[in-house]
Amino acid sequence: MDGRQDGPFPFIRSIGTACLAACMLAGAKTPAHTQAGAKMIAMETMKVGSAPADFDFARTGQGGASQWVVVDDATAASKLAIEQSSTDRTDNRFPLAIYQPVTAKNVEVAIRFKPVAGKVDQAGGIAVRVTSPNDYYLVRANALEDNVRFYRIVKGRREQLATANVKVASGEWHSLGLKAENDRFTVVFNGKTLHSTSDRALPGPGRVALWTKSDSVTRFDQISIRILP
C-alpha cells in the first residue's frame, strides 16, 4: 500500500492565485463528471492501493501522519472509495485530504461517507475555504456521538458554530453536504437541512478537503463540487 502521508503544503502558496482557479476543474488531472452544474470526481479512474490523485494531505493538531488510500468497496457507487486508514488515537488530530484543482469562496460540496472503525471517533467531514491546515470551515458527522456539527477553525483553534443530534450509523453510507455562500453556511445530512449559520471569520477563497478525526477509519465516495456565483 503506497497511500501518501502528510507532507508539504504547496496549496498554501497558490491560494493567492485564486482568481485563476475560478475555472476550477477545467485543468484537473483526474477526470470529473458534470452533473447538474456540479463536478463529480471520477473515482473509477483511481488506482487501488495508491493515494487518491489530485489530493494533497495535511493534518490539523497533533499526532501521527494520516494515511489516505484508494480501496475496493463493493458498496461504493463505483466500487472504489477513498479511505483514511491510520488509527492514531491522538484526540486532537484531524487529517485532511485537500483537493488541489479547486479554489473557491462560494461553493457547494456533497459527499457520501461511511464510518468504518474507530474507538475514539468515527467521524467524516467536509472542509471549505481551506487556506492552511489550521484555517477552514468544517462540517462533520460522528457515528460515536450521533451528531452533525459545523465549526470554524482559525489558527488551529476549533470553535463550534452549530450542532444537530441525528443518528449516524457506523458501517453505513451517509450523504453530507455543505453550501458556503458569502457569510452563510448550510448543512445537509441524509437529504435533510440541519442548520444554516452566518460567519465572517474566513471571507476569502480556499480549497475543498475531506476530513476525519483521531483514529477514525472513514471512507468517502460520490464527491461533487459546484462553484457558486
Each predicted region: which residue ranges?
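Short, solvent-exposed beta-strand-to-loop segments that form ligand-recognition rims
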Residues: 188-207
